Amino acid sequence: MTNSPVCRAEHINHIGIAVKDIDSTLEFYKTMFGAISSGIEEIEDQGVKAALVRVGASQLEFIQPTDENGGVARFIESRGETVHHICFEVDDLQGKLDKLDNEGVRLIDKTPREGLSGMSGFLHPSSRAGILYVLVDRNTAKR
């Protein structure tokens, strides 16, 4: 990889956390931290229901599996309820995905897809330290 950033990020859009029970998780964060939820949305093609939650200037995404054989269910089974991904906000998402692909970074998505937080692209956890990274296009990002 080069010395200059291949994929300069504007900031972290959110941290995703895999949970078994999104309702009790949302209630806990509301009661303990004054978190404000965007509401729960079902994302059928990913086998999850999810909610973006604002805590001050920061944002979290809680993800509960709805498909017991899906990726998030397997993630919770192997790692428990914990941080699932880090989402960076970027300009020109497709351009960033192309650059990363050209640099040999293993991608889950070579083209953007609609996600809860906006048009997104996923980098495979094997690309760095077993962490799932998500890039969200700044122009479609929910804040």
PLM feature spans:
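N-terminal beta-strand motif that seeds the catalytic metal site of vicinal oxygen chelate
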Residues: M1-S24, E81-V90, N139-R143
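Vicinal oxygen chelate
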Residues: T2-R8, A51-L52, E61, F88, ...
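Short, structured motif recognition centered on aromatic/hydrophobic residues
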Residues: I12, V19, L26-Y29, V53, ...
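Amphipathic alpha-helical segments
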Residues: D21-I36, D101-E103
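Conserved catalytic-core motifs of GNAT/GCN5-like acyltransferases
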Residues: I36-E44, T111-E114
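A short, acidic/glycine-rich surface segment
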Residues: S38-G39, N69-R74
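C-terminal "cap" of GNAT-fold acetyltransferases
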Residues: I43-Q59
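Short, solvent-exposed interaction modules
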Residues: I76-N102
